[in-house]
Amino acid sequence: MGVSDVFAVSGALEVVLEGVAGKGVMAVVYGSTRTSTIPGISIAGPSPEATLYTPTLDIEYLVAGRPLTLDVVPVSPEGVPTPAVITRAVARAFNIPLLPVDAGSWTEARVPHAKLPSRVTGGRIDVEPGLPSGASERLFREAYMLGSSLARGLDWIAVGESIPGGTTVAAAVMEALGYRAADLVSSSGKDNPRELKKRVVAQALSRLRECGARDVLEIVDCVGDPVHVSIAGLAVGAREAGAFVILAGGTQMGAVLAILSRLGMLDPRSTAVATTKWIALDRGSSIRGIVESIAPGLTVAAAGFSLEGSRYRGLRMYEEGYAKEGVGAGGSLVISLLRGAGVREILEAVESEYGRLLGG
């Protein structure tokens, strides 16, 4: 029970166990990229265009218990519910404070949240810059200030994400910064559209010369999105304020690590990745391969939590390879398990929350 239900994909689990002792908070940085509207790239919404609204709906549901902008809970075309169901259930059951951070949503969430002043929706990276010139530097700086302020007096801070299309953009960022990634990132779908992603990444990389990118943040302007660079800034600010940093997400956290590594701001001793077993054991991607190429020795912890025995079909579909991770789900699971929660307790909390959702 608890600690025994978390396993190390790489690195030492003890690092995370010590890191999550004491007080902490989970920030969820969210935003949109038009890359998600490329047909087949993301199933984090009922249609490609609907994926632009998913981060806002995720956050509204996370905070208010239901979406407010549209009267629809984010689901895949197959009806698989957003991973925010897991995050909300676990955070409420095991007292994990949540702070949504808007880095560039398509439409503003109608719940209390932090807003980065330079927030901006990302472009479609195969045909246009990911961000306006200078946006990455501004977002990094603003998120750094937020992380520095937020982490004062805390022992740890976890940072999740919500950005459909994020794994494709993350692959482009990692490749542009010199790391192999295009065939290693995961997908929210059961079948990873690897060839499509590689094609989009190649088109984005072909524009680097056109962008005139000369440094790390200019490269992110060219092929990135608002979320990964904001998480990077927040992580540095929090770490320098004395908090242990948990990157609560899947393979796209590799883009955060790549940005930090190329900026010379990555500290594997005070940073870890926490994710779900659905990412850790995914045969269509390799979070271990990504992290070990960027930050050898950095710990990746995964929650052994399963939904196989759930009475709800929508939740059991996670075991078939759908959704896998997002909105801090893996981080919330790892943190709660390491702090003594049991998998049965968590399953009851998740099923109770999903049942409430279905009941309206």
From Swiss-Prot:
Alphabetized GO MF terms: nicotinate-nucleotide-dimethylbenzimidazole phosphoribosyltransferase activity
Pfam families: DBI_PRT
Annotated InterPro entries: Nict_dMeBzImd_PRibTrfase (IPR003200), Nict_dMeBzImd_PRibTrfase_arc (IPR002805), Nict_dMeBzImd_PRibTrfase_sf (IPR036087)
Disulfide bond sites: none
Lineage: superkingdom: Archaea
Family, similarity comment: Belongs to the UPF0284 family.
Matching PANTHER family: PTHR38811, UPF0284 PROTEIN SLL1500 (PTHR38811:SF1)
Protein name: UPF0284 protein APE_2029.1
